[in-house]
Amino acid sequence: MSELLIRQFPCLSDNYGFLIHDPDSGETATIDTPDADVILNEADQAGWSITQIWNTHHHFDHAGGNETIQALTGAKVVAPRYDRHRIPGISMEVEDGDVISLGDHKAKVFYTPGHTMGHVCYHMPMDGIAFVGDTLFALGCGRLFEGTPAEMWHSLSRLAALPDETRIYCAHEYTEANARFALSIDPDNHDLQVYAAMVEGERARGEPTVPTTIAAEKAANPFLRPDDPAIRARLGMEHDDDEEVFAEIRRRKDSF
């Protein structure tokens, strides 16, 4: 089985587009469709034909290009069953535990409500990668537009249980702002300090901070660390449960 090829590129103001390509079958999937024109151009430059669209959730900056790309390529749209009435052009509805294929490469569907109630992520264990949409960000997590803190914490906990080396492809370049907030919550964390300095350098050079890894996020992302004694002490929540601490971190980020 050939190595999966990944093409990452900026879309809109701060989204990332991702094309994944299996050389053996010639199949190509776009992860979400933030900007149809940009995605189609990237596929054309690579010499790839888009055969699948994998949607993570219904927001326009993730599914807004579905109809254009589908009309021009005939691509099959894979999307969460919960969003059957909110995402256009669905060919295959998926839910937690389903497995989809791109050639011989397999992706397991994780249902991850929180940011939205239909959100899913796509974990490709043989390739050591996961496409997580707006659930987990580098040093952050998605805003809770539809779900509860409890639902988001459960979703993040599932992602945190993936192998440490898993490369995490999140859908937005938010890391600089996330780092500033993380340092306000966990200022003495050496791993976070190193990570934040690295991010500052990458962004100064115009480089992406995505992908990240599960290991890096578990060490530095406060949204995955509500059990940390230093964070709990700073919040005055030494005796609260992880879910409550997570909810308070999210509340503070919303007004940061």
Swiss-Prot record:
Pfam families: HAGH_C (PF16123), Lactamase_B (PF00753)
Protein keywords: Hydrolase, Metal-binding, Zinc
GO biological process, one term: methylglyoxal catabolic process to D-lactate via S-lactoyl-glutathione
Cofactor note: Binds 2 Zn(2+) ions per subunit.
GO molecular function, one term: metal ion binding
Keyword Lipid biosynthesis: no
Enzyme Commission number(s): 3.1.2.6
Top-tier EC class: hydrolase
SMART domains given in the database record: Lactamase_B (SM00849)
Reactions that this protein is recorded to catalyse: an S-(2-hydroxyacyl)glutathione + H2O = a 2-hydroxy carboxylate + glutathione + H(+)
UniProt superkingdom: Bacteria
InterPro entries according to UniProt: Clx_II_MBL (IPR035680), Glyoxalase_II_hydrolase (IPR050110), HAGH_C (IPR032282), Hydroxyacylglutathione_Hdrlase (IPR017782), Metallo-B-lactamas (IPR001279), RibonucZ/Hydroxyglut_hydro (IPR036866)
Pathway: Secondary metabolite metabolism; methylglyoxal degradation; (R)-lactate from methylglyoxal: step 2/2
CDD domains from the UniProt entry: hydroxyacylglutathione_hydrolase_MBL-fold
Cofactor dependency: Zn(2+)
Binding residue positions for Zn(2+) 2: D61, H62, D134, H172
List of residues binding Zn(2+) 1: H57, H59, H115, D134
Keyword Zinc among record annotations: yes
Oligomer status and interactors: Monomer.
Similarity section: Belongs to the metallo-beta-lactamase superfamily. Glyoxalase II family.
Name of the protein in question: Hydroxyacylglutathione hydrolase
Annotated source species: Maricaulis maris (strain MCS10) (Caulobacter maris)
